[in-house]
């Protein structure tokens, strides 16, 4: 009986310790490196962005556009005013 009580207290203590030790930490998925930040450019480049012969063009990533959230209707719900 004592062994069961001691193991349950130990498990609770370890659980609390693991929770509070990781609470303030943040794990970024893609940490940004200061020298590796790329600007975004439009998907269809204009004539001013076209590279000329012998000139290097700045490497950029395509811009991401935020899509509007699609509205969904709950069947049988009354319209809200």
Curated annotation (Swiss-Prot):
Keyword S-adenosyl-L-methionine: no
Assembly information from the UniProt record: Interacts with SUSD2; the interaction is direct.
Residues annotated as signal peptide: 1-24
Subcellular location: Secreted
GO terms for cellular component: extracellular space
Keywords: Antibiotic, Antimicrobial, Chemotaxis, Cytokine, Disulfide bond, Secreted, Signal
Organism: Sus scrofa
Disulfide bridge partners, by residue number: 40-63, 41-60
Pfam families: GPR15L
Keyword Mitochondrion in annotation: no
Gene Ontology terms, MF aspect: chemokine activity; G protein-coupled receptor binding; receptor ligand activity
Official protein name in the record: Protein GPR15LG
Biological process terms in GO annotation: angiogenesis; defense response to fungus; defense response to Gram-positive bacterium; G protein-coupled receptor signaling pathway; lymphocyte chemotaxis; mast cell degranulation; negative regulation of cell cycle G1/S phase transition; negative regulation of cell division
């Amino acid at each position: 009986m004592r062994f069961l009580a001691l193991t349950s207290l130990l498990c609770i203590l370890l659980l609390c310790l693991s929770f509070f030790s990781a609470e303030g930490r943040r794990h970024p998925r893609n940490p940004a490196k200061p020298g590796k930040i790329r600007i975004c450019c439009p998907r269809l480049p204009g004539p001013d962005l076209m590279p000329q012969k012998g000139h290097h063009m700045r490497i950029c990533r395509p811009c991401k556009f935020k899509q509007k959230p699609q509205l969904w209707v709950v069947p049988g719900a009354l319209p809200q005013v």
